[in-house]
From Swiss-Prot:
Reaction catalyzed: (2S,6S)-2,6-diaminopimelate = meso-2,6-diaminopimelate
Keywords: Amino-acid biosynthesis, Cytoplasm, Isomerase, Lysine biosynthesis
Protein name as it appears in the record: Diaminopimelate epimerase
Pfam short name (any one): DAP_epimerase
Organism (species): Moorella thermoacetica (strain ATCC 39073 / JCM 9320)
GO terms, molecular function: diaminopimelate epimerase activity
Pathway: Amino-acid biosynthesis; L-lysine biosynthesis via DAP pathway; DL-2,6-diaminopimelate from LL-2,6-diaminopimelate: step 1/1
Length: 279
């Protein structure tokens, strides 16, 4: 099975053209094999390129544990670059079908080469049942959540997938690996949740660490950065246009007051290509 390894700010993926490659029927099992960092290729996710009846192409993504999230911000930037450079799609603007709906990435070209990708992530969902999250009252702003005997205050947003955002004084020392998995599986979140730990540097800059649903702590999360920007604006901590600093670089996030959509701009990088044995 031919593949391309790519990353968006260290959030890495194995991309496969499932329209031409023979892909096993057990996709969760394939993802677990491929994403394993010792016995496979190693990645935060497996991305499949598929035909679509609703858009130009369809993207499916599977986490290292075999679960299938609705969307992935860093993943769709890699997807957009991959399909453009392999000739599967033409033009700078794409429409991609995902479980979160139609997502619209736009390639940023410099000298004919892809320098980055700007993605229209659509409008954030703030209603509790759309996140989804148990309880009553929307939007969910700084709501107390009991974790390991402590009370954390979370602001919850869906960017097509669920996010719980915690604002902290110092993200470097945040208990991502202990609080993150507990919140991911908290009874409040029937579909589990991604968990962001955010330090507000100023009204235009956020620093982020993330515990991703089904993947653990990763170097970056595009939908998480979008959720963090929305949460910051909703709670008055930051502006609607911010730079989100992650371990390997930055994402530019803008929550437009014009159309209520969130726009994410960042890199997508090819690492290597290869063939993975399926036998």
């Amino acid at each position: 099975m031919h593949f391309v390894k790519m990353h968006g700010l260290g959030n890495d993926f194995v991309l496969v053209n499932a329209m031409t490659e023979k892909v096993p029927g057990d996709l969760p099992g394939l993802a677990r094999r491929v994403c394993h960092r010792r016995f496979g290729i190693g990645a935060d996710g497996l991305i499949l390129v598929l035909p679509s009846e609703q858009a130009r192409l369809r993207m499916r993504i599977f986490n290292p544990d075999g679960s299938e999230p609705e969307m992935c911000g860093n993943g769709i930037r890699c997807f957009a670059r991959y399909v453009y450079e392999t000739g599967l799609a033409e033009g700078e603007e794409l429409q991609v079908e995902t479980l979160a709906g139609i997502i619209k990435p736009r390639l940023i070209l410099e000298g004919g080469r892809v320098a980055g990708v700007r993605v229209d992530m659509g409008a954030p969902h703030l209603e509790r049942e759309q996140i989804p999250m148990a309880g009553t009252g929307s939007p969910v702003l700084d709501e107390p959540i009991e974790v390991n005997g402590e009370t954390w205050r979370g602001t919850c947003v869906s960017m097509g997938n669920p996010h719980c955002v915690f604002f902290v004084e110092d993200v470097t020392g945040a208990p991502v690996t202990t609080v993150g998995p507990v919140v991911e599986h908290h009874p409040l979140f029937p579909r589990r949740t991604n968990v962001e730990f955010i330090q507000v540097l100023n009204r235009e800059e956020l620093r982020m660490r993330v515990w991703e649903r089904g993947a653990g702590e990763t170097m970056a999360c595009g939908t998480g950065a979008c959720a963090a920007a929305v949460a910051g604006a909703l709670t008055g901590r930051s502006n609607r246009k911010v730079t989100v600093h992650l371990a390997a670089g930055d994402l530019q996030i803008e929550w437009s007051p014009v159309d209520n959509h969130v726009y994410m701009t960042g890199p997508a990088v090819e690492v290597f290509r290869g063939d993975f044995p399926l036998d």
